[in-house]
Regions:
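Sec/Tat signal peptide C-region and signal peptidase I cleavage site
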Residues: 20-25
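Extracytoplasmic ligand-binding site segments that recognize negatively charged/polar headgroups
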Residues: 34-44, 68-72, 92, 98-236, ...
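Paired acidic/hydrophobic, glycine-rich loop segments that form the ligand-binding mouth/hinge
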Residues: 88-96, 237, 254-259
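Periplasmic-binding protein-like
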Residues: 147, 222-231, 260, 272-293
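Mature extracytoplasmic/periplasmic domains
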Residues: 285-286, 290-360
Length: 382
């Protein structure tokens, strides 16, 4: 009896030494993200501490699957395997994925339609929240951010920048070798320029963005690119996304398509003259979002709360805009008053929220996208 009493006393002593609340294991919210390492760092270093403070006992753990569509494909394969295995709970609560991955996962019933269950869902109206390269993802995703392609230009040289692709076509003839882009192999800023050109000159804007795909439209795409071959005689071909910015910095060209977030990052690092500007021309140029999604067998309540925080105007302003120079995932007008005046002017002085709403376009759906690249190689590059 004395031995049992001694054991009981020892157990009480051990329990007394354990901090209250740690007897029960923490709940882990698993965030799996495609993209570069900065995506993982953003979740672990910025979002996680805020969410954990709001939810004592919850631990956010982010892991990355790598950049590009390949990163999203790995998340798809992971969810698909767990679905086929009949797992009661999956080990991904929040997925951060590209458009192509989202389209596949919605089609295969791997994601929950959660957007209308979170208050921030009503703060998003851009078509990219509903349409992922022609696939209907309405309700299943919320954009984390939007990256956008636009024209960067030197206002000392380009006094009156073109407002449309038609005006640009006229401008390069009057200002030969002052415009540069990287074709379709050196980076997506050049690809975005080419798809923007086809949108402007083919009359196929809705079809390119939403489908359905019609292979009979290939001659229309090829015809729209005929003018681009002549256009290229008056321009400089740059070596890539960074190459276009570098040539702008050195004054070798005065205008060219760039990723806006790269543009502002280069400017902040002193790699571009501070007077450089950006412009989004009619009828528009493409950009692309990253999406927050909730898998079918996730910890749904916590996942929705996490995404609601991540897409709130306050976090979008501080985390997405100020830290990364990305455009917000929610409509930009909802950030007014959340950003200091300097940050607002920096990001929206040249391209307004209305410009993003009307001229920020998605890339064409996959089969048209491939047709454009193939036609460019045949009709323009050769």
């Amino acid at each position: 009896m004395k031995r049992l009493q001694g054991l009981g006393a020892s157990m009480l002593l051990v329990l007394a030494m354990v901090p209250f609340g740690s007897v029960q294991a923490d709940t882990t919210l698993n965030v799996v993200t495609a993209g570069d390492q900065n995506m993982v760092d953003y979740v672990n270093n910025y979002l996680a501490p805020r969410f954990e403070k709001m939810n004592p006992g919850v631990k956010v753990r982010a892991v990355g699957t790598g950049p590009g569509d390949a990163g999203s494909q790995k998340i798809y394969e992971k969810l698909s395997a767990q679905s086929k295995a009949g797992a009661a709970a999956w080990d991904v609560d929040v997925a951060v994925i590209h458009q192509r991955g989202a389209a596949t996962m919605v089609k295969e019933n791997l994601l929950l339609p959660y957007r209308n269950d979170v208050s921030v869902g009503k703060l998003v109206s851009r078509d990219t929240a509903k349409n992922a390269l022609g696939a209907n993802v309405d309700g299943y995703v919320l954009p984390m951010f939007h990256s956008q392609i636009a024209f960067a230009y030197n206002p000392d040289v380009v006094k009156t920048p073109p407002k449309s692709f038609t005006e640009l076509n006229e401008w390069v003839r009057k200002n030969p070798k002052q415009f540069g882009y990287n074709g379709v192999k050196g980076g997506m800023s050049g690809v975005g320029f080419v798809t923007g050109w086809v949108t402007a000159y083919s009359g196929m804007a809705d079809k390119l963005e939403k489908g359905p795909y019609d292979p009979a439209m290939k001659p229309v795409i090829e015809k729209s690119l005929a003018g681009l071959k002549e256009f290229n005689q008056y321009v400089v071909m740059t070596p890539g996304n960074a190459g276009t910015l570098d040539m702008l910095n050195r004054g070798e060209i005065a205008m060219g398509p760039v990723w806006v977030d790269m543009f502002y990052t280069w400017m902040a690092d002193g790699k571009l003259p501070p007077n450089m500007r950006v412009k989004l021309v009619a009828p528009g140029m493409p950009g692309q979002p990253m999406y927050y999604a909730v898998p079918v067998k996730a910890n749904t309540k916590l996942a929705e709360e996490f995404i609601a925080l991540a897409t709130s105007p306050e976090v979008q302003a501080e985390g997405i805009v100020k830290r990364f120079n990305w455009y917000p995932g929610i409509d930009a007008k909802n950030l007014e008053g959340k950003l200091d005046e300097a940050a607002w002017k920096k990001l929206f002085a040249d391209i307004s929220p209305d410009d993003l709403q009307t001229k920020g376009k998605p890339f064409p759906i996959a089969p048209y996208f491939n047709d454009i690249l193939e036609a460019y190689e045949r009709k323009v590059a050769n």
